[in-house]
């Protein structure tokens, strides 16, 4: 069964039910199924290789992704924000059989192309009946940041997501009565997953051409959103907008957060502005999909990313691959039916394999109750004064300080210590903490060798397209484009 396994059934049973809304356009299930079928017929006849989709965020991209999946072809979803040189390098590696682009490609679409006239724009004729694709065929290549600077293309088979759909039904109970708001870019796997998950369930999926808190709030109100997918920065901006307007979203029953740890100081505002929503955050990776889930009702220990997601088995291993007991820190390995197939852009040094278990280099430990605690990424580890330090631990503590909105701790070359710690900070509005105060704050919570002595304020906090802190961009600000705290 493919990720579009239930689309035709929903179209038959509930033809007039809304399936997809984006940018002022809404498709019913009958209309979506018919359009996907026509576009799938076009893609099935394309030259061998993947279907490259280099398009702005929107309904056209969503439909063409589903069409490639139904055709048994691999949708390679590029980020339209990439520089031209990076785009060219990625295309040279993934070599699509057909490229659909708003720039240059085999099929060129206008940047504003919607669903009206989409089939004609790609040269699709009438739909032809076709068998369901093999569940072990690849359907998707997404891209995530690579240690070399070139995005890594990871490949997934249908089965990895259909198994996820079934597992998260058990976790979250998403069904045909839900209205799913996924206001981020489809080049980010979280929001692409939300789209596919919603269509599989027969829900109404709300997308946005770009993330704007006001537009997200308006979509939620106008269509009665019940489920919100987001990364912490987006959810926080949405909450700030609701607070500024004196509004709430009482119709939301579930907020699903991923990409980074949700700040504890924001929980009260979330409960006030989304008063009927259960909050759950999950840890995962592009290669791993769901790994753990942390639900408010399950009394997750402070600092933990939760318990294993349904269908997932966790282990902690040392550098030699030996399994470690509870409480011991090592590399986090995951076994599940949700794992990716391989890298479409070649070998990655960040991937570790032990039997049927895979690790992307995250370090952590399991407590006696089976909750996972992440320490950091092995590739971000800093050696200072001969000791290994994971900067994520320091960042998490700094972000509990009321004056700090975001923190990034990096190592700067130091002839005596190996690397000197520098804490880069985005300060909360109107706040101006002194360096000595921050040192004292950290010394009461961390060992002395983990306490930075240098603090730099960053006026315009760099973010990746997916809303995460852009650490390489922050490193480039040192020392001339940041302001040292006195």
Predicted feature locations:
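Conserved pre-ATP/AMP-binding loop-to-beta segment of ANL
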Residues: 3, 15, 125-143, 150, ...
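Conserved ATP/PPi-binding loop(s) of AMP-dependent carboxylate-activating enzymes
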Residues: 307-311, 322-352, 387-389
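Conserved AMP-binding/adenylation subdomain of ANL enzymes
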Residues: 162-179, 187-227
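Conserved AMP-binding A3 loop
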Residues: 28-30, 139-163
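AMP-binding/adenylate-forming catalytic domain of the ANL superfamily
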Residues: 447-468
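Gly/Ser/Thr-rich phosphate-binding loop
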Residues: 227-229, 241-301, 313
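Conserved AMP-binding/adenylate-forming core of the ANL superfamily
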Residues: 8, 16-45, 56-58, 66, ...
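AMP-binding/adenylate-forming catalytic core of the ANL superfamily
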Residues: 228, 336, 356, 363-450
């Amino acid at each position: 069964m493919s990720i579009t396994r239930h689309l035709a059934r929903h179209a038959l049973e509930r033809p007039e039910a809304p399936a997809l809304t984006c940018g002022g356009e809404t498709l019913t299930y009958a209309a979506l199924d018919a359009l996907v079928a026509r576009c799938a017929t076009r893609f099935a006849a394309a030259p061998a290789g993947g279907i490259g989709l280099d398009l702005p965020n929107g309904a056209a991209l969503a439909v063409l992704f589903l069409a490639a999946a139904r055709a048994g072809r691999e949708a390679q979803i590029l980020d339209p924000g990439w520089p031209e040189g990076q785009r060219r390098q990625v295309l040279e590696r993934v070599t699509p059989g057909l490229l659909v682009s708003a720039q240059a490609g085999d099929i060129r679409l206008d940047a504003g192309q919607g669903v009206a006239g989409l089939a004609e724009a790609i040269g699709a004729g009438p739909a032809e009946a076709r068998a369901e694709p093999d569940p072990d065929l690849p359907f998707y290549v997404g891209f995530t940041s690579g240690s070399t600077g070139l995005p890594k293309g990871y490949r997934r088979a249908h089965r990895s997501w259909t198994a996820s759909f079934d597992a998260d039904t058990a976790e979250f109970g998403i069904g045909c009565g839900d209205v799913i708001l996924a206001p981020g870019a489809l080049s980010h796997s979280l929001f692409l997953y939300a789209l596919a998950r919603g269509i599989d369930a027969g829900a109404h999926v709300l997308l946005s051409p770009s993330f704007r808190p006001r537009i997200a709030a308006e979509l939620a109100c106008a269509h009665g959103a019940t489920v919100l997918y987001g990364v912490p920065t987006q959810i926080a901006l949405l909450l700030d907008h609701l607070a500024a307007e004196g509004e709430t979203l009482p119709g939301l029953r579930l907020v699903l957060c991923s990409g980074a740890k949700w700040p504890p100081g924001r929980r009260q505002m979330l409960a006030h502005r989304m008063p009927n929503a259960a909050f759950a955050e999950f840890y995962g990776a592009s290669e791993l999909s769901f790994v753990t889930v942390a639900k408010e009702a399950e009394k997750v220990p402070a600092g933990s990313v939760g318990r294993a997601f349904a269908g997932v088995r966790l282990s902690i291993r040392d550098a030699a691959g030996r399994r470690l007991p509870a409480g011991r820190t090592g590399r986090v390995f995951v076994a599940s039916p949700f794992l990716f197939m391989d890298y479409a852009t070649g070998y990655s040094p960040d991937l570790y394999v032990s039997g049927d278990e895979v690790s992307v280099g995250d370090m952590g430990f399991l407590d006696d109750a089976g909750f996972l605690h992440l320490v950091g990424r092995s590739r971000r580890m800093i050696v200072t004064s001969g000791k290994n330090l994971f900067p994520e631990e320091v960042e998490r503590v700094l972000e509990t300080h009321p004056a700090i909105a975001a923190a990034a701790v990096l190592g700067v070359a130091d002839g005596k210590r190996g690397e000197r710690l520098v804490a880069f900070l985005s300060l909360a509005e109107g706040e101006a903490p002194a360096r000595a105060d921050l040192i004292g704050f950290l010394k009461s919570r961390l060992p002395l060798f983990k306490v930075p002595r240098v603090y730099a304020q960053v006026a315009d906090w760099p973010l990746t397209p997916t809303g995460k802190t852009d650490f390489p961009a922050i490193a480039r600000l040192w020392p001339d484009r940041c302001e040292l705290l006195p």
